[in-house]
From Swiss-Prot:
Assigned protein family: Belongs to the universal ribosomal protein uS15 family.
Single GO term (MF): structural constituent of ribosome
Gene (UniProt): rpsO
A biological-process GO annotation: translation
SUPFAM superfamilies reported for this sequence: S15/NS1 RNA-binding domain (SSF47060)
Subunit structure: Part of the 30S ribosomal subunit. Forms a bridge to the 50S subunit in the 70S ribosome, contacting the 23S rRNA.
Entries under Pfam families matching the protein: Ribosomal_S15 (PF00312)
Entries under NCBIfam families matching the protein: S15_bact (TIGR00952)
InterPro entries membership: Ribosomal_uS15, Ribosomal_uS15_bac-type, uS15_NS1_RNA-bd_sf
Highest rank taxon of the organism: Bacteria
Species in which this protein is naturally found: Shewanella sediminis (strain HAW-EB3)
Protein name: Small ribosomal subunit protein uS15
GO cellular component, one term: cytosolic small ribosomal subunit
CDD domains associated with the record: Ribosomal_S15p_S13e
């Protein structure tokens, strides 16, 4: 249920600040968003998968905290990121 290596590499190339950047806030949020979007399709088929739903909620909360941190520290990068990811419509 996780992303494969190609998808991860694509996200790292698009959102990373440099090559091999896996720890920046933008990359972490982008990876979490991709995993969350992937799991949403899973839950359309498996409505009663509560074990995975707990993991989804954990990812959503982690992403929320990372976005709050980015907004507090670097608002311009925050605005660019949510526009790129299509969050907060």
């Amino acid at each position: 249920m996780s992303l494969n290596a190609e998808q991860t590499a694509t996200i790292l190339a698009e959102f990373g600040r440099s090559e091999g950047d896996t720890g920046s806030t933008e990359v972490q949020v982008a990876l979490l968003t991709a995993q969350i979007n992937h799991l949403q399709g899973h839950f359309k088929e498996h409505k009663h998968d509560h074990h995975s739903r707990r993991g989804l909620l954990r990812m959503v909360n982690t992403r929320r905290k990372l976005l709050a941190y980015l907004k507090r520290t670097e608002n311009v990068r925050y605005q660019e990121l949510i526009k790129k990811l299509g969050l907060r419509r």
